[in-house]
């Protein structure tokens, strides 16, 4: 099975909110864009929360959320996964991202939101203990996954939960 690699974090300039996924799905990896699957509601939610047109370019969407102090990244740097499903991540293949460099650059980080349960579990298992001292003043919160695989929760309920990032 081939090892897949995630992306670098988006702009960290002035960031105080980190939204963490687990590992980009196949559609995102192919397009080299966070949350690129057409049925992933992440960008639809961001557009509604921060009042921009969801159809603007990917680069413009990144600029809009960066202006709100938000940076996107994933817990994992590398892993093996035969599909886009988090449940298919081969545990023995997991390599977390380098959070030491990230936290050094983003000392003003105040909130970390996990886009789904798997991102939170991977962070807890592979990252949080190592960085306990950097995380003492950081709020950690899990939000419902925006992935189409988490279709049991409707859009309006997801949007309601995600409103927490603007509070």
Placement of each model-derived feature along the sequence:
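Short, surface-exposed acidic-centric catalytic microdomains
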Residues: 28-90
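Internal catalytic-core helix/loop-beta-alpha segment
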Residues: 67-122
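C-terminal capping/extension of enzyme domains
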Residues: 1-13, 37-38, 85-97, 124-167
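Short, solvent-exposed loop/turn segments at secondary-structure junctions
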Residues: 24-27, 41, 77-81, 117-121, ...
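Short, hydrophobic/glycine-enriched beta-strand segments
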Residues: 16-22
């Amino acid at each position: 099975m081939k090892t897949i690699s995630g992306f670098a974090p988006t702009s960290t300039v002035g960031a105080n909110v980190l939204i963490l996924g687990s590992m980009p799905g196949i559609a995102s990896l192919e397009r080299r864009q966070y949350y690129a699957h057409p049925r992933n509601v992440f960008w639809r939610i961001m557009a509604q929360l921060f009042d921009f047109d969801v159809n603007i370019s990917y680069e413009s969407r990144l600029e809009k959320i960066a202006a709100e102090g938000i940076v996107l990244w994933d817990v994992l740097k590398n892993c093996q996964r035969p599909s886009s499903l988090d449940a298919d991540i081969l545990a023995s293949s997991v390599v977390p991202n380098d959070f030491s460099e990230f936290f050094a650059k983003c000392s003003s980080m105040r909130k970390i939101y996990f886009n789904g349960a798997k991102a939170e579990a991977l962070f807890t298992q592979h990252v949080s203990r190592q960085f306990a001292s950097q995380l003492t003043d950081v709020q950690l919160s899990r939000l419902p996954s925006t992935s189409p695989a988490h279709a049991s929760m409707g859009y309006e309920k997801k949007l309601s939960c995600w409103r927490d990032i603007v509070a």
